[in-house]
Amino acid sequence: MHELIKNQLLKKFNNPILKELLDSARLNYKEKLAFTTDSFVVSPLKFPGGDIGKLSVCGTLNDLIMLGAVPEYLSLAMIVEEGLEYATLESIIDSIASTAKKAGVQIVTGDFKVVEKGACDKIFINTSGIGRIITGKLSPKNIIPTDKIIVTGRIGQHGFSVLAKRKELDLGFNIKSDCAQLSDLIIPVLKKTKAIKFMRDPTRGGVATTLNEIAQNSGLGITINEKDIPTSSQVKTAGELLGIDPLYAACEGRAIIVVKAKNAKQILALLRKHPLGRQAQIIGEVTERFRGRVIINTILGTQRFIDMLTSDPLPRIC
């Protein structure tokens, strides 16, 4: 264990706070902070566009970013099944280190446990994050009718990527996960405008479930337009073949942003300047009709309600 800590963890997450190896990380702050935690049990461990290591960093960082916080520190805890190949573990650690370094965050504390075979499935990871809040309070209570809804990129990529890899589906094409940390996309926009009311990342349950949560928490209705929702042809085809609506498939590198109507096009233009925001779209608006519900204007010219996810067709996608 000590050799693993010295040769892998301390070496690859190299920073003076972690090197102290104290029971807690000693941090000095006088500013407003955001603090979050998340656990990751994705199966398979690797998928097109990422792995459990990258996901464990991006997922927690994105939760901080959605609150208007610049991520700074992470904790890392790993529960490893006895018999996991060392090369697999090393690859995951390398992925964590690389993703954290690119994001400019430090892993300053952590834990490592080995459990008997069968007590977990290969490896489970928990990360917690601390970030410095740079905006006013982002809240669903800020939302008013006429506010616009933006999604920052093509939806459903992660959910379908993981499912296809897990089931070894021969779809005739690959679907790459959108797994990415969003600080380089979102933070510059937050620094240039105060017109953002609220943000969420549409992970479990996808865009549909996240929009329903926003509608319920704001006490208002949301109407979206099917023709405006950015969806790749591969995800559309996979959804039709598997009977899964892409609106319910998880994203791990997208944000849903509620903005003032008059600033929506300006914010959209800012997002599109970054590679992760190239396919950003205004997909709908907040209304006073059907409070707490989400309605979609379909490409057939009809309307229907979009409900919360009631069962999970894509378990263990994060």
Question: How should these model regions be labeled?
Answer:
Residues 1-49, 67, 76, 95-108, ...:
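Extreme N-terminal cap/leader segments of soluble proteins
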Residues 2, 9, 274-318:
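Acidic, Ser/Thr/Pro-rich beta/coil linker or hinge segments at domain junctions
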Residues 14-16, 23-25, 65, 97, ...:
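A generic local secondary-structure boundary/capping motif
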Residues 16-20, 202-203, 221-230, 248-250, ...:
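Beta-strand->loop->alpha-helix junctions that form or flank phosphate-binding loops
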Residues 29, 33, 40-42, 70-162, ...:
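Glycine-rich anion-binding loops of enzyme active sites
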Residues 48-74, 94-102, 184-191, 209-212:
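Small-aliphatic-rich amphipathic alpha-helix that forms the alpha element of a beta-alpha
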Residues 81-83, 175-251:
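Active-site-proximal betaalpha loop/short-helix elements
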Residues 259-265:
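Helix N-cap motif at beta-to-alpha junctions
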